[in-house]
């Protein structure tokens, strides 16, 4: 069982989407169920509407799920599991205040040591715990042995007990911490493989320790994906616009192109241009590079152009939403436009009212002739017929003709454009 477990706290990051795509591909390859779990236990950071937005984005990318969970609805199970650990003396109530802990952290810092919980409350007698009226958290006792796990990308990793420490699993308000909720849910939902960003590597031994302490002995496999760097080679921040999946979509980049690019990023793929369904046939998670991958927007735009060309004409017409059969014309313009947004602008320039500028007289002459001109199969015949009828020459012929047909004074060769614009010439002459 594979899962994607986002939090509804902001726009979906491309790193999160990459994890969703990889989990989905692996689930499909192994004919296993795929889980979508919304991790909403940090109520103060949740943003209204983001849960639905996550589902909408996944649907756009062709990612479906067989099971859907809301983490906060599992709260009773989190509390039951915490109580079990306390009753078995594997976890304990900690009454240390934030101020006390902060003072100990400062002391460790001055001594040049890494802070570790000193076990102040670990050996409190039961009667002392019962009689203490202070608020408390619950800590899981640190493991007694080295925690090891194998990662499909990073190989075997190990963590010593002192580096895991006795960590908090339940807060003072009786809600679970991220690691505890995540570990318990993965256990309850029978997740068998976790693919996520490498920023979670330090969480993995804690989650392994939680499940082991609860007596869960089913093996879990992992793949921690390297971080995505920006074009300057620095870790991509959520504040950077193109780190947001929503921004990429609103900019007119197709979901299929984003998927293609994210699968390629830091990976060895047999082809440069492919679909999600094609990738499912050959994708290998172990081939993903250990090294961070640099995001290249220009490369993504190049891939997007190729995916626009691959779209069926009726589907592209629907996306362009301009009430005309413009698919072939739009595909021709991918030599200049890289996104759906740019293509719409090109199409609007062609079919909207034009500014003729200094060529107003010439444009009027040509428009009258174009209203019922014979539409020859090849451009040379069309051009010669129009030249003869208009008596215009050189710049005073070609520039106004370009404005009428494209709405711009610059653009593709008219001879190249003609086969795609031919059927619209009579209409354009009447605008």
UniProtKB/Swiss-Prot annotation:
The kind of enzyme this is, by top-level EC class, is ligase
Q: Name one GO biological process term.
A: glutamyl-tRNA aminoacylation
Q: Where is this motif: 'HIGH' region?
A: 6-16
Top-rank taxon: Bacteria
Q: Which Pfam families does the record associate with it? A: Anticodon_2, tRNA-synt_1c
Which InterPro entries does the UniProt record give? aa-tRNA-synth_I_cd-bd, aa-tRNA-synth_I_codon-bd_sub2, aa-tRNA-synth_I_CS, aa_tRNA-synth_I_cd-bd_sf, Glu-tRNA-ligase_bac/mito, Glu/Gln-tRNA-synth, Glu/Gln-tRNA-synth_Ib_cat-dom, GluQ/Sye
Can you name one GO molecular function term for this protein?
tRNA binding
Q: Where is this motif: 'KMSKS' region?
A: 235-239
Principal localisation: cytoplasm
The record's catalysed reaction(s) read: tRNA(Glu) + L-glutamate + ATP = L-glutamyl-tRNA(Glu) + AMP + diphosphate
Entry-linked Gene3D superfamilies: 1.10.10.350, HUPs (3.40.50.620)
SUPFAM superfamilies in the record, alphabetically? An anticodon-binding domain of class I aminoacyl-tRNA synthetases, Nucleotidylyl transferase
The GO cellular component terms are:
cytosol
Cell membrane recorded as keyword = no
Keyword line: Aminoacyl-tRNA synthetase, ATP-binding, Cytoplasm, Ligase, Nucleotide-binding, Protein biosynthesis
- Record: residues binding ATP: 238
Belongs to which family?
Belongs to the class-I aminoacyl-tRNA synthetase family. Glutamate--tRNA ligase type 1 subfamily.
As for what it does, the entry says:
Catalyzes the attachment of glutamate to tRNA(Glu) in a two-step reaction: glutamate is first activated by ATP to form Glu-AMP and then transferred to the acceptor end of tRNA(Glu).
Protein name per its UniProtKB record:
Glutamate--tRNA ligase 2
- Taxonomic source organism: Campylobacter jejuni subsp. doylei (strain ATCC BAA-1458 / RM4099 / 269.97)
């Amino acid at each position: 069982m594979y899962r994607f477990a986002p939090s509804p706290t902001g726009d979906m990051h491309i790193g999160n989407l990459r994890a969703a795509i990889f989990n989905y591909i692996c689930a499909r390859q192994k004919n296993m169920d795929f889980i979508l779990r919304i991790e909403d236990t940090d109520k103060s950071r949740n943003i209204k509407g983001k849960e639905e937005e996550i589902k909408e984005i996944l649907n756009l990318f062709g990612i479906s799920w067989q099971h859907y969970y809301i983490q906060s609805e599992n709260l009773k199970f989190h509390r039951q599991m915490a109580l079990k650990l306390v009753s078995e003396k594997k976890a304990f109530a900690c009454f240390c205040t934030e101020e006390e802990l902060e003072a100990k952290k400062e002391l460790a810092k001055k001594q040049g040591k890494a802070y570790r919980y000193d076990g102040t409350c670990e050996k409190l007698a039961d009667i002392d715990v019962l009689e203490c009226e202070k608020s408390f958290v619950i800590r899981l006792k640190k493991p007694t042995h080295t925690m090891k796990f194998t990662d499909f990308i990073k190989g075997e990793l190990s963590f010593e007990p002192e580096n895991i420490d006795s960590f908090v699993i339940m807060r003072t308000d009786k809600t679970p911490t991220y690691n505890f909720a995540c570990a318990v849910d993965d256990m309850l939902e029978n997740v068998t493989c976790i693919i996520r960003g490498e920023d979670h590597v330090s969480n993995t031994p804690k989650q392994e320790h939680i499940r082991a302490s609860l007596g869960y002995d089913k093996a879990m496999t992992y793949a921690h994906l390297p971080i995505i760097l920006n074009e300057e080679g620095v870790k991509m921040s959520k504040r950077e616009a193109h780190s947001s999946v929503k921004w990429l979509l609103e900019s007119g980049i197709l979901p299929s192109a984003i998927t293609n690019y994210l699968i390629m990023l830091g990976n060895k793929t047999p082809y440069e241009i492919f679909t999600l369904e094609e990738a499912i046939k050959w994708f290998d998670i172990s081939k993903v590079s250990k090294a961070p991958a640099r995001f290249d927007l220009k490369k993504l735009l190049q891939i997007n152009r190729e995916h626009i060309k691959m779209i069926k004409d009726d589907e592209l017409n629907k996306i362009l939403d301009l009430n005309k059969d413009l698919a072939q014309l739009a595909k021709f313009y991918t030599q200049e436009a890289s996104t759906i947004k740019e293509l719409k602008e090109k199409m609007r320039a062609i079919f909207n009212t034009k500014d003729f500028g200094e060529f107003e007289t010439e444009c009027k002459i040509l428009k009258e002739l174009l209203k019922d001109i014979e539409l020859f199969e090849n451009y040379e015949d069309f051009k010669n017929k129009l030249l003869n009828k208009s008596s215009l020459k050189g710049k005073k012929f070609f520039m106004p003709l370009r404005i009428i047909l494209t709405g711009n004074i610059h653009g593709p060769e008219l001879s190249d454009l003609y086969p795609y614009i031919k059927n619209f010439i009579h209409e354009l002459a009447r605008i």
